[in-house]
C-alpha cells in the first residue's frame, strides 16, 4: 500500500484501514506460530503498512 493512496483518505477511513490491518497481522502471527505461513515477508509488509497508517493519523491529528 502506497502512502499516496493513504493520504487521500480521511481519518475515519484510515481508522477502518488500521483495524483491518491489525486483524490481518493477528491472523498472520497465528499462522506463523502454527507454521502454516509460507511467505513470512507478508508479516513485515503488514507491519509497515500499519506504521504508515498510524503516521498519517498522527499527521492529520496535528493539523
From Swiss-Prot:
InterPro entries, sorted: Ribosomal_protein_uL29, Ribosomal_uL29, Ribosomal_uL29_CS, Ribosomal_uL29_sf
Pfam family, one: Ribosomal_L29
Disulfide topology: none
GO terms assigned for molecular function: structural constituent of ribosome
Keyword Transmembrane helix among record annotations: no
NCBIfam families noted in UniProt: L29 (TIGR00012)
Full protein name: Large ribosomal subunit protein uL29
Lineage: Bacteria, Pseudomonadati, Pseudomonadota, Betaproteobacteria, Burkholderiales
